[in-house]
């Protein structure tokens, strides 16, 4: 076997393309546009309302996982699990995240060569002169098979910046999904807790109605016996009917919460029924961290920060438009007019070579696009900082709210204890004939009002606890919550 003479006489046929390819690879390590640096935010050392709160530690159960389990209610846990799997708003956000994840795969694929295969047969005809004596029909067959490879050399980093932007956008979409899940979980837990307090309110009013019915019967008997006047009967009737009306109103309120829970779980209200229970979930002890931890715990803050990263990378994409695009192409195959010798050495062909494309004039469109993307970046930075401030505000508000409700609960309980004692003394005086029934009615009304006030403030404390947990990010964490699954 002899060497090809062209190879012996001119070895540069191999060296020059290799050198060119090496230069392209080295240049492709560069990327125009700014590298990302997380914007700074002013973070206080601790929350203003943190005095008296238990500080969170790494061992606290609140730091990770299903935060709603701190209420110790198995029924609630099952409802939230159903929400996580069946809520339609969550499904929308999950689909948006899958779209963003697909864009990441598409952008990553643009970094690699594209391989194409084409094969086909064509038949063509060319008109011939009527005087032709060749006997040819003028019909020709052509067989073609071609394999092509093309690769865009990412010399200026346009494709890599695009991948960086799409990855950050996917992470932001994942954080948006977590934020929506947290919001809906919080809504369901609040509805459930309010419903359970209403169940207790309903039991209170039902027992009160029974007591008032007995009082009305007794008052009527006393009126018929001439012991009391007609006004006592009228007052007892008023007291009973007012309480019955309040009980009916609670039934409507409970139905609203029950229907809301059904829809949150992706069910029609007619398909869901939540039986009453005899207990109210206990108020949890909520540990609080330091403000800097909030930046890692809240998914909405993480989403805002990832949006900055995406905008920053898009600046590089926009600036890369000022530079030429380089594409390396290689193709080869077989072309013949006869099927029998189609795939044969004489019928092969090939081509190889680079291409360059550069926009020379665009009347300022590229410059305007860079200015637009830089303005988008500034906008996302401002949005991020505002989101952080809003997060601090929410935590401070709910911490103060819980403290105030705790103090109010103490005073409300003291008022209830006093009202119960007053009712006991008044009832004894009425039985002894010292006072009339109207005095008893007034004290009973006050006692019932205080009973309901204690339950109302308990409901407010439970709701505020949910809001505080959600404001601190629930069980979400940026270190694991921004991992994109392929």
Residue spans for each PLM region:
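Membrane-embedded beta-strand positions in outer-membrane beta-barrel channels/transporters
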Residues: 80, 144-148, 192, 237, ...
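Transmembrane beta-barrel architecture of outer-membrane proteins
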Residues: 31, 76-78, 142-144, 190, ...
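Sec/SRP-type N-terminal targeting helices
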Residues: 91-92, 108-109, 153-181, 231, ...
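A short glycine-centered flexible hinge/capping loop motif at secondary-structure junctions
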Residues: 223-227, 430-434, 471-475
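Small/polar, glycine/serine/threonine/aspartate-rich low-complexity segments that form flexible
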Residues: 55-71, 120-148, 271-287, 316, ...
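Terminal intrinsically disordered/low-complexity segments used for targeting and assembly
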Residues: 2-7, 14-20, 26-85, 143, ...
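Periplasmic alpha-helical coiled-coil/stalk elements that build and connect Gram-negative outer-membrane
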Residues: 159, 175-290, 401, 405, ...
